[in-house]
């Protein structure tokens, strides 16, 4: 990144805004501080020079070079650059400097300008619009639009619809455009390798500035800041670089990578140029220009979606306060604050703001405008959005738009821009579905409807065709439209919409339509439509109208030959046959003359991409079929036969003549062949050079006359190894064939893509082989033509001019290439020179169609980028342009023709499939007829068989045939049964899914409608009356009904309750934690000591310690007992109430009694205070509601059980009556008819009494239901099949229910019959026996009379029994009915109460949130008050403890002085001195405690500066004259007293320091107490205010509850409010008082009377008790005084004086003495140990002494011997000397010195021995004082003696 070093002086004066000033200042600071490679240094060239080199290398514009070297004459020279020594040099551009447009833009490439002019094609007009390109609609002024069309920018005047074109400079496309805020400049960001951004001035359209090196491949978006001095750009893949430009200086200011995925947009914040925003694929990022220590940087913060789903963000807007409002894919608005989503905005009901993505968001005049893919523009309130915030966990906030404009459901708004028209609020909108709209967003009563200014194709253009007669062209695309244009007059004429997208198109030749009015279009669903174009002005229908369209399209024919998209259409050269090709691998032929009657089709080995009939020069009519997968077929023209369609079974053409060429890749062979040729040419050149060199050498030899010249070594180059030839390569996937054309009969040229691109291949069909397999066939082309620069850019389409001298090629990258050919050159020998120019977009603008006009004056192209271009072809003849094309006149009678029925269903049958379906239906019809005939025959045979069976039954038994005799063959029956079972299994398998589906459906219905029911309505009828009783229809209680919210249902405890529950021991455990921890640590240490081995001394010491501990513990227990007793006395005295003490509870009770005495406070009273236990909330009310429902449900369930029991009783009664009636019938058969009593009618069961049987069914019921349903469906029409089936289902259900009830009746009858038979069997009735008639005897007559009497009695008994059963049942029913009526009344009251409770619950829920807030505040303040009160109590306790400690320390200090005074005794003359020593103040170093705090560090620093640990100071009480020295004990002063004074002084200082510390702690505690007390008062005030607020809110809630209407039924005797003895009409002023409350008040009177008598009795008893206690107190006082006197006498008798018994009890041991004893014991043990050690050392030293003595003795003996020998030698020597002369006399000096040394050594050793003996003696004594050994220093070290 390169940054400017200084600012342009011309611009610097004009920039006055705050942001620009900041930016310039930061840039200067950056340039002055940054020394990285991005900034300029001395001697480094500016990037302009580098760019010039690159431009020169790329053969691009030379304007920059001219700018550096010499300016053009038309340009003003740039401002001269002042060169300063040792300073950076920077080019400064003048404001009047412009680049040269002709030298800047890209120009066509011409291989040879001699044959082809440079401007062979000139852009005439653009009919397309890349509507899916982001921000591809800009407004330059009120009439001019700017948008990108391929490699051009189009300036469109939408008033007169003229166009101006600006060509790109790179020739590789344009990425983005942006307009200056002042509309004086616009930026064009291009594509290519390191593309440029060119700033054009408007309206002059001069290139003003060029920005370089901002992206690697292409730009995605550019945007000017609000002031227009900065430009932001963002690149596409792969770098995604965001750059901030100072565009007037052509300098990049900041640069960084924006993101790692596609970035859609970058914009400046309109209110702050230092903030930017980018958005793109799955992200949004917020940028800020920050000044860091390394300079000005661009820092980005990536937006975090959090819980929100990640979304691609197309549109956003920066709000003035720094927030950003963005859209989302699902249509909601996201409000960003910082880098987080603050809130997600949606519409009411959780509906999205737009149905689809939001593509643009704008701020305009305090409103937010959003445009979405749903075709709607919505206006939102800015303040609502700016202040939006989340209200719940969903993160959503519901808002509604202020205004809304819905354009159309087929509109997809991609971007919008406002028109600057005064007084209007017009906007231009880019529709991604192919339109530019003008919208009026004023939303007033004169608002205009949306106006479509321009309409285009949306997306890639699929096909283009031109009229063979005039300047008309037709296009189609996947946007389901067909459009016709007049490209000569530059006007779109007409367009027509369909349901499916168009994929191919052809204009019918004049041989088909003389007026060239027919257009054939193929669609993606396989349909082919023939459209007729005509001029409607010639119709009589439009006669007299003013606005008549220029052209109309009429659907003439429609047919569907294919099942997939139609990819190719071709008319035979005579126009007799139309051929269609498709992706479904079929070619279909139609007879054009017979209204496109289908001829037939055949299959191909691959999807078809092109069809071409042989030209007229070929002898035969053949069709060239090019498939995508490498197959090229040739078919003869099919013969047209007059065959009736009804007789044709299939349209497949049999025995079709096909020749196939299966293309095999030969590119690697061609490359190998070309390489071989190149090497051969190189060899030939080398040989030629060798020959020339030899000839030259021969000439030189002749010139010099030399005979032989050595030959040059020329074989070096030949000996070099050549690289290997390219390998033969076959691509794994065959290369697709893109296009092709005939050259000669049986020969053709093809262009391929992928690997085989770069050549045109000349191929020839092999000879025809019948039944050959195309898959196994492999063919290679026999010739090829090399195409320059098409390795990665193959030819997509090829067309020729009418005279075949120009070949127009449409390239894959959107370029046009024109080859100039010779006449009659089918082999393309002259394919060398060409004209090449990029027109469409290089990335996605592949040319789909290219064709010339009928007279070769125009060339038309259509690309996948949605652009349609018309070019003027260079011609030597001047042809008039702009002539309006003639639209064909309408045919006669066209207006009266009925339009054919269109095929709109994409799943409709194709022609072949429809024919197959028809044949299949015919076949199935014949099969069904045959089956019906067979069934009729079988039916006849079956009837005959049944007749035979009937005849067989009529025969006698012995003559009848058995059923098995009719079986002809058992195997046949077994086989039939087997097949039947297999068929059943198969059917079950086939219907398993349906079965499970219906079972699940039934289960779901039952779960939905029957499962929730606990009991259905059961109606029980009486038998002898019309009375009936119905049960309740109950739903099962929900499992969630009993749940409650414990946090809300719990009532806040009152203060009294809390105080009672807490008790005195609250938080005491917090105190004891430290002690418990320390005890635990001590126990751990003690456990650790057990593992160490103990010595005897340790055991003795521990025993002594244990004894002392026991004594101390005994004394501590006594002391603890005394203290406990004192504490109990203190508590007892503290609990003693004062004489005027009153119990607070009694006071409160008396106060409440006085307040509410004689007053029953109503809830409607304004001062009504709700007690805490009566406060209600939503949860409690919900519990009441649940309890009421439970109670009502329980009562209803109990009543249902009773009714069900009654129903069961009726069933039992009916069963018994049926048995009795059957028995009655049997009895009446035995008595005369005259004595028959009428048989009682048996009660019947109604369907309402057994509703559960409605859902019981059997197979017969289901079959009947199916038959009924089928009949109803047959009767209903096909259009009303849905409603009809529903109605039939309902009717069937009713019939099914009726059938079910009938079946139940049968079952009941059957059951009754069975029961009657059982009853008769039990009664053992005599069966009638048939006898022959005879005269009865007298005995028989007597028996008959007796039986008759018996039967008559039984008849009467049975009738009575039946009557009794019915009457009893009816009585039970009446009784239960009466109970149910009462329960119904209660249930109605319950429902009314339920309604009231529900209303109260809803009201309480509204109050719940605020109440919870107030309650939470009260609870928090209450808890805070309790905590502070506890802190106060704790502080008071600590203060009391510290005061006790201070008192103890003061007592210790007094005791210290008293003890020292006693030690001094009387008349001690050093008393004053010693007292001064004791009282002297000394500065001591502060002791570092183990458990230090934060202040110890400072104390340690201060103590480290002290010179010594003790430093004397003067006594404060004395004067300066009283200075004395306390370091030396005075003469005659007792040393022990002096030492005691020093020790006690240390103790005094310790006590004083402790006192100071304790007083500091007390002061701190007082301060803390005061602070907390103040806080308690504040909290108490706040608590009272909060409780009052809560109480007021409770009153408000109660008042709102009182406003609810409650229904209370009253009887007249309950009304006691009478006026003149009558009930008044208006009862609004009455009070409804419950009996329960009234009874309670009356009971309260009795209770109070009883309580009064009880209290009087208790008062009397308390007075008697008080008198008794006073008497006992006097007696106890006398007893205590007697006991005190006895104790005093005992003390005097035992101790001689009165002593302190407590001190005596606590006196156990003298701890100091015991400690000294333990120290003494330890010292003795250590001394004994040390004594043993010294004894061992003495023994060792004695041994060493003895050894040394022996050695010394030995040495002395040696010395003695040596001395004797020396003496002898001396005497001999003396003798010799005396003989020689007496020169020397006496001993030598050396001998004297040696002798003295030996003597001293002996003396020293003797002294050591004496000292050691004394020390040994001393150590042997017990109490001897051990002194250091005497080691006398030797004066001189012993030197070795000379021998």
Curated annotation (Swiss-Prot):
InterPro entries per the UniProt record, alphabetical: Beta-prop_EML_1st, WD40/YVTN_repeat-like_dom_sf, WD40_repeat_CS, WD40_repeat_dom_sf, WD40_rpt
Effect of a null allele: Mice are viable and show no malformations. However, homozygous males exhibit complete male sterility due to severe defects in sperm mobility. Sperm from mutant mice is characterized by normal flagellum length, but most of them showed abnormal forms and irregular caliber of the midpiece. Females are fertile and give litters of normal size.
Tissue specificity of this protein: Expressed in testis.
A single cellular component GO annotation: motile cilium
Residue stretches of each WD repeat: 214-255, 258-297, 308-346, 353-390, 456-495, 497-541, 561-600, 790-829, 842-881, 1699-1744
Acidic residues: bias regions: 41-58, 705-724, 1492-1524
Pfam families per record: Beta-prop_EML (PF23409), WD40 (PF00400)
Keyword Transmembrane helix: no
GO BP annotation list: cell morphogenesis; cilium organization; flagellated sperm motility; microtubule cytoskeleton organization; nucleus organization; sperm axoneme assembly; spermatogenesis
Positions with biased composition (Basic and acidic residues): 1047-1071
Coiled-coil intervals, chain numbering: 1548-1603, 1631-1665
Phosphoserine PTM sites in chain numbering: 1069
Keyword terms of this UniProt record: Cell projection, Cilium, Coiled coil, Cytoplasm, Cytoskeleton, Flagellum, Phosphoprotein, Repeat, WD repeat
Matching PROSITE patterns: WD_REPEATS_1, WD_REPEATS_2, WD_REPEATS_REGION
Function: Flagellar protein involved in sperm flagellum axoneme organization and function.
Similarity remark: Belongs to the CFAP44 family.
UniProt-recorded name of the protein: Cilia- and flagella-associated protein 44
Encoding gene per record: Cfap44
């Amino acid at each position: 990144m390169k940054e400017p070093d200084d600012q342009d002086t011309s611009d610097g004066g004009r920039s006055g805004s705050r942001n620009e000033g900041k930016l310039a200042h930061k840039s200067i600071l950056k340039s002055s501080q940054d020394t990285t490679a991005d900034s300029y240094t001395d001697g480094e060239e500016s990037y302009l020079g580098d760019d010039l080199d690159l431009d020169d290398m790329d053969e691009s514009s030379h304007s920059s070079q001219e700018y550096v070297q010499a300016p053009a004459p038309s340009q003003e020279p740039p401002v001269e650059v002042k060169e300063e020594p040792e300073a950076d040099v920077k080019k400064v551009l003048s404001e009047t400097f412009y680049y040269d447009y002709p030298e800047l833009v890209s120009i066509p490439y011409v291989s040879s300008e001699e044959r082809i002019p440079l401007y062979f094609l000139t852009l005439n007009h653009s009919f397309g619009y890349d509507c899916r390109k982001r921000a591809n609609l800009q407004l330059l002024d009120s009439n001019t639009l700017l948008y990108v069309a391929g490699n051009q920018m189009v300036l469109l005047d939408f008033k007169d619809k003229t166009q101006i074109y600006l060509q790109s400079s790179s020739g590789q496309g344009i990425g983005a455009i942006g307009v200056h805020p002042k509309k004086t400049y616009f930026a064009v960001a291009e594509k290519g390798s390191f593309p440029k951004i060119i700033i054009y001035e408007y309206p002059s359209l001069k290139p003003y500035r060029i920005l370089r090196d901002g992206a690697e491949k292409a730009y995605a978006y550019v945007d000017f800041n609000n002031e227009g001095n900065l430009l932001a750009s963002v690149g596409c893949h792969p770098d995604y670089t965001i750059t901030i430009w100072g565009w007037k200086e052509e300098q990049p200011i900041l640069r960084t990578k924006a993101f790692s995925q596609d970035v859609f947009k970058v914009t400046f914040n309109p209110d702050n140029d230092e903030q930017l925003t980018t958005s793109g694929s799955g992200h949004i990022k917020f940028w800020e220009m920050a000044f860091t220590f390394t300079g000005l940087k661009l820092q980005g913060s990536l937006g975090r979606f959090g819980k929100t789903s990640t979304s691609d963000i197309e549109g956003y807007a920066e709000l003035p306060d720094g927030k950003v409002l963005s859209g989302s894919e699902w249509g909601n608005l996201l409000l960003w604050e910082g880098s987080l989503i603050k809130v997600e905005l949606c519409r009411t009901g959780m509906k999205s703001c737009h149905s689809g993505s939001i593509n643009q968001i704008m701020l305009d005049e305090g409103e937010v405008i959003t445009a979405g893919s749903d075709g709607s523009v919505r206006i939102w309130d800015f303040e609502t959005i700016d202040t939006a915030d989340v209200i719940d966990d969903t993160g959503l906030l519901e808002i509604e738009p202020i205004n809304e404009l819905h354009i159309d459901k087929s509109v997809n708004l991609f971007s919008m821009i406002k028109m600057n028209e005064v007084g209007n609020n017009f906007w231009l909108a880019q529709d991604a579905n192919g339109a530019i709209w003008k919208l009026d967003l004023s939303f007033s009563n004169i608002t205009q409807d949306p106006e479509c200014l321009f309409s285009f194709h949306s997306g890639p253009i699929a096909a283009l065709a031109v009229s063979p007669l005039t300047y008309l062209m037709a296009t189609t695309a996947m946007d389901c439209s067909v459009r016709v244009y007049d490209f000569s007059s530059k006007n779109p004429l007409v367009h027509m919409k369909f349901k499916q997208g168009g994929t191919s198109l052809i204009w019918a030749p004049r041989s088909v339509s003389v007026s060239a009015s027919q257009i054939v279009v193929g669609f993606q669903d396989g349909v082919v439509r023939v459209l007729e174009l005509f001029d409607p002005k010639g119709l009589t229908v439009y006669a007299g109208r003013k606005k008549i369209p220029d052209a109309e399209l009429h659907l003439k024919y429609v047919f569907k030959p294919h099942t997939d998209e139609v990819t190719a259409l071709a008319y035979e050269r005579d126009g007799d046959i139309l051929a269609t090709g498709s992706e479904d691998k079929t070619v279909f032929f139609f007879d054009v003359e017979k209204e496109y009657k289908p001829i037939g089709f055949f299959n191909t080995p691959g999807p078809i991409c092109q069809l071409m009939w042989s030209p007229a020069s070929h002898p035969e009519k053949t069709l060239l079929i090019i498939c995508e997968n490498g197959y090229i077929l040739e078919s003869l023209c099919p013969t047209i036969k007059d065959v009736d369609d009804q007789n044709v079974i299939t349209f497949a053409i049999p025995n079709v003549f096909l020749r196939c060429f299966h293309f095999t890749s030969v590119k690697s062979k061609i490359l190998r062949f070309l390489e071989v040729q190149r090497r051969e040419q190189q060899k030939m050149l080398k040989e030629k050079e060798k020959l020339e060199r030899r000839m030259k050498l021969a000439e030189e030899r002749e010139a010099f006359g030399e005979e032989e010249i050595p030959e040059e070594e020329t074989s070096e180059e030949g000996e070099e190894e050549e690289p290997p030839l390219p390998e033969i390569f076959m691509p794994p996937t065959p290369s697709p064939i893109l296009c092709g054309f005939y050259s000669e009969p049986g020969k053709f040229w093809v262009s391929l893509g992928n690997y085989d691109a770069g050549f045109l291949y000349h191929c020839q069909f092999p000879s025809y082989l019948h039944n050959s397999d195309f898959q196994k066939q492999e063919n290679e082309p026999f010739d090829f033509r090399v195409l320059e620069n098409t390795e990665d850019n193959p030819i997509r389409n090829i067309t020729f001019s009418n005279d075949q001298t120009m070949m127009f090629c449409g390239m894959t990258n959107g370029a046009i290439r024109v080859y100039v050919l010779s006449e009659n050159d089918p082999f393309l020998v002259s394919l060398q020179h060409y004209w090449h120019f990029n027109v469409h977009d290089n990335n996605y603008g592949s040319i789909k169609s290219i064709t010339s006009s009928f007279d070769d004056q125009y060339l038309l192209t259509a690309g996948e980028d949605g652009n349609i271009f018309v070019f003027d072809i260079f011609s030597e003849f001047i042809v008039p342009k702009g002539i309006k094309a003639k639209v064909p006149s309408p045919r006669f009678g066209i207006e009266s023709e009925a339009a054919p029925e269109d095929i709109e269903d994409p799943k409709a049958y194709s022609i072949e499939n429809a024919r197959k379906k028809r044949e299949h239906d015919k076949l199935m019809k014949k099969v069904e007829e045959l089956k019906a005939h067979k069934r009729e025959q079988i039916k006849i045979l079956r009837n005959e068989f049944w007749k035979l069976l009937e005849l067989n039954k009529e025969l006698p038994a012995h003559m009848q045939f058995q059923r098995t005799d009719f079986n002809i063959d058992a195997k046949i029956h077994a086989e039939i049964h087997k097949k039947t079972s297999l068929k059943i299994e198969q059917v079950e398998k086939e219907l398993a899914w349906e079965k499970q589906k219906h079972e699940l459906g039934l289960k779901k219905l039952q779960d939905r409608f029957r499962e929730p029911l606990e009991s259905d309505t059961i109606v029980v009828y009486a038998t002898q009356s019309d009375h009936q009783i119905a049960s309740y229809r109950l739903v099962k209680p929900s499992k969630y009904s009993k749940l409650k919210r414990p946090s809300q249902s719990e009532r806040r405890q009152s203060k009294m309750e809390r105080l009672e529950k807490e008790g005195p021991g609250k938080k005491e455990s917090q105190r004891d934690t430290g002690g418990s921890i320390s005890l635990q640590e001590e126990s751990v240490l003690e456990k650790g000591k057990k593992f160490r081995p103990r010595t005897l001394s340790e055991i003795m010491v521990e025993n002594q310690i244990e004894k002392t501990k026991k004594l101390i513990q005994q004394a501590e227990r006594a002391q603890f007992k005394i203290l406990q007793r004192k504490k109990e006395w203190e508590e007892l005295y503290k609990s003693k109430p004062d004489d005027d003490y009153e119990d607070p509870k009694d006071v409160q009770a008396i106060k409440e009694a006085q307040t509410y005495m004689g007053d029953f406070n109503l809830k409607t009273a304004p001062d009504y205070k709700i007690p805490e236990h009566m406060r209600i909330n939503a949860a409690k009310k919900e519990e009441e509601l649940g309890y009421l429902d439970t109670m009502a449900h329980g009562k209803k369930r109990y009543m249902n059980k009773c009714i069900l029991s009654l129903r069961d009783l009726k069933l039992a009664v009916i069963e018994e009556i049926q048995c009795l009636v059957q028995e009655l019938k049997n009895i009446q058969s035995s008595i005369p008819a005259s004595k028959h009593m009428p048989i009682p009618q048996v009660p019947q069961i109604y369907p309402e009494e057994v509703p559960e049987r409605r859902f019981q069914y059997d197979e017969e019921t289901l079959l009947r239901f199916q038959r009924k349903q089928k009949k109803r469906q047959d009767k209903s029409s096909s259009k009303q099949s849905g409603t009809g089936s529903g109605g039939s289902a309902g009717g069937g259900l009713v019939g099914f229910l009726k059938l079910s009830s009938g079946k139940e009746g049968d079952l009941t009858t059957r059951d009754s019959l069975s029961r009657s038979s059982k009853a008769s069997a039990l009664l053992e009735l005599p069966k009638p026996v048939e006898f022959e008639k005879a005269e009865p005897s007298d005995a028989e007559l007597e028996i008959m009379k007796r039986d008759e009497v018996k039967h008559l009695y039984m008849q009467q008994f049975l009738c009575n029994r039946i009557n009794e059963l019915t009457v009893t049942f009816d009585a039970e029913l009446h009784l239960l009915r009466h109970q149910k009526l009462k329960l119904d009344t209660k249930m109605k009251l319950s429902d009314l109460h339920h309604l009231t409770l529900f209303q109260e619950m809803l009201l309480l829920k509204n109050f719940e949130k605020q109440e919870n807030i107030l309650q939470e505040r009260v609870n928090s303040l209450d808890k805070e008050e309790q905590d502070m009160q506890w802190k106060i109590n704790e502080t008071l306790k600590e203060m009391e403890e510290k005061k006790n400690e201070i008192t103890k320390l003061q007592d210790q200090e007094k005791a210290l002085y008293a003890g020292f005074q006693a030690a001094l005794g009387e008349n001690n003359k050093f008393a004053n001195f010693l007292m001064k020593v004791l009282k002297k103040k000394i500065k001591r170093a502060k002791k570092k405690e183990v458990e230090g705090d934060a202040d110890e560090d400072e104390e340690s620093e201060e103590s480290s500066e002290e010179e010594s640990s003790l430093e004397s100071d003067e006594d404060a009480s004395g004067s300066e004259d009283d200075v004395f020295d306390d370091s030396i004990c005075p003469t005659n002063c007792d040393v022990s007293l002096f030492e005691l004074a020093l020790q006690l002084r240390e103790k005094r200082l310790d006590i004083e320091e402790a006192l100071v510390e304790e007083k500091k702690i007390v002061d701190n505690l007082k301060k803390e107490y005061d602070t907390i007390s103040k806080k308690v008062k504040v909290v108490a005030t706040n608590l009272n205010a909060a409780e009052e607020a809560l109480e007021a809110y409770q009153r408000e809630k109660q008042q709102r509850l009182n406003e609810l209407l409650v229904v209370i039924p009253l009887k007249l005797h309950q009304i006691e409010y009478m006026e003149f003895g009558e009930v008044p009409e208006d009862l609004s002023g009455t009070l409804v008082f419950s009996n329960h409350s009234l009874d309670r008040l009356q009971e309260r009177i009795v209770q109070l009377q009883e309580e009064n008598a009880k209290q009087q009795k208790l008062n009397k008893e308390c007075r008697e008790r008080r008198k008794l206690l006073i008497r006992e107190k006097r007696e106890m006082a006398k007893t205590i005084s007697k006991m005190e006197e006895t104790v005093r006498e005992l003390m005097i008798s035992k101790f001689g004086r009165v002593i302190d018994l407590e001190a005596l009890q606590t006196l156990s041991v003298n701890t100091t003495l015991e400690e000294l004893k333990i120290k003494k014991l330890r010292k003795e043990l250590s001394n004994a140990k040390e004594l043993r050690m010294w004894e061992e050392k003495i023994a060792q030293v004695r041994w060493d002494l003895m050894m040394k003595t022996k050695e010394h003795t030995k040495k002395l003996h040696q010395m003695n011997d040596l001395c004797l020998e020396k003496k002898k030698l001396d005497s001999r020597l003396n003798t010799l000397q005396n003989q020689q002369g007496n020169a020397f006399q006496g001993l030598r000096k050396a001998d004297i010195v040696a002798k003295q040394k030996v003597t001293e050594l002996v003396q020293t050793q003797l002294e050591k021995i004496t000292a050691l003996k004394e020390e040994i003696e001393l150590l042997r004594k017990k109490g001897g004082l051990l002194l250091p050994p005497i080691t006398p220093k030797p004066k001189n070290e012993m030197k070795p003696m000379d021998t």
